[in-house]
Amino acid sequence: MFTAVLMSEKYQNCLPAVQKKNLAVVGAGPAGLAFAINAAARGHQVTLFDAHSEIGGQFNIAKQIPGKEEFYETLRYYRRMIEVTGVTLKLNHTVTADQLQAFDETILASGIVPRTPPIDGIDHPKVLSYLDVLRDKAPVGNKVAIIGCGGIGFD
C-alpha cells in the first residue's frame, strides 16, 4: 500500500516511526541519501546500497561544473549524516533480489539513465554525452555544439 505525505520545505516534522522497520535503500544518489537519513532519523534500521565506490550519484557529476562546487559540501553533509543516523552503507555492492528478501521494505532510488535523442548521426564518434565529458573525461574540441537547453545543457 502506498501512502502519500504532503510536506512543505519550510515545515517538516520528523516524527518517530510508529512501527520500526528494517529498510533497504538501493541507490546512494540524491533521493536515496535523503530517504535513508530521514528514515533512520525516524528510528528505522536502514541499509543503503550502491554499486559505485562513493555516494552521491549525479551530485558527483554536478560538482564538477564551475559554480556548482557547493555539491562537495552537500556530499560532506550526507556522509556525516549517514554516520550520525547509523545508516549502514554498502558501496561497491550490486544488491540482488535474494538479498533484499531479508528486509521489510525496499526503496528503489537507482538514479537516472540519460536520454539519447533520436537524431541522425547521434552515434558518430565525435558526438559526446555530458557523462562522456564530465565523468569519463573524453577530450572535447575547441568548437562545440550543445544539443538541449535544459539544466545540463546550460551548465
What are these regions (language model features)?
Residues 4, 13, 46, 79-80, ...:
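Intrinsically disordered, low-complexity regions enriched in small/polar residues
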Residues 1-19:
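Cysteine-cluster motifs in flexible loop/terminal segments that predominantly coordinate metals
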Residues 16-51, 55, 90-98, 102, ...:
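Rossmann-like dinucleotide/flavin-binding elements
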Residues 57-101:
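N-terminal Rossmann-like dinucleotide/flavin-binding domain of flavoprotein oxidoreductases
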Residues 11, 72, 77-78, 130, ...:
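Sequence-level detector for tyrosine residue identity
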Residues 107:
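N-terminal Rossmann-like NAD(P) cofactor-binding module of classical short-chain dehydrogenase/reductase
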